Amino acid sequence: MCGITGFSNFKKSIENEFNNIVEMNDCLIHRGPDSCGYYKHKHVIFGHRRLSIVDPFGGSQPMTKKINGFNYTIVYNGEIYNTHIVKKNLLDEGYTFVTYSDTEVVLLSYIHYREDCVKHLNGIFAFSIFDEERKCIFIARDHLGVKPIFYSIKDDYLIFGSEIKSMLKHPLVSSVVSREGILDLLSLGPSRSLGNGIFKDIKEIPPAHYLCVFEHKVVLKKYWKLEAKEHKWGLEETKEELTYLLEISIPLN
């Protein structure tokens, strides 16, 4: 478990707002007690708290790769089960790796596939990438929403974080509970309706969605849907198929 947070504004410089990310990141120390890191750009500031599991020295974040003169920077929380498959495909495309971490695999996957990178990832994840070439922030959440990620768009700012309390440390994010939030607390609490962040200024990126924020537009898109199909097999066929699926899926995890 790691923690990610950050904010951006493509219409003005935010370099003098670094203290905000420090306060936001400090709220996530329980998610990543091993180390912390920051990335600062004229329009983008990222923070990361790390729990080191794979490649403790090579997987430090935020991680930046420079391709064709443009920087791509990621903060990532998760685990990719098919890392070796995605990595091999990228190696075949001519990419090189300098670490053993899945963070680098996710970042290069985005650089090659762009938004479609999520269709190649099998795992649990929430990550944000600053794409300097396209001048955008790309945030994605895993298919079933195991890893949390919240965001707010206000006054030309994008603000995001693994937890609500880190976002509340940003001066633009209000702690006022929304009408929908009150309804959720009274009817569903401690659960929430899909996409609701309880607070007025905060939303949740739903499972199997990505958010792409440009200077003049915002795109929230669903990239995967679980399809319900009529079950027509008998008992023995069902047992064989279930056994097969377990045998191929468990080693990946």
What are these regions (language model features)?
Residues 1-253:
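Cysteine-centered catalytic environments shared across enzyme families
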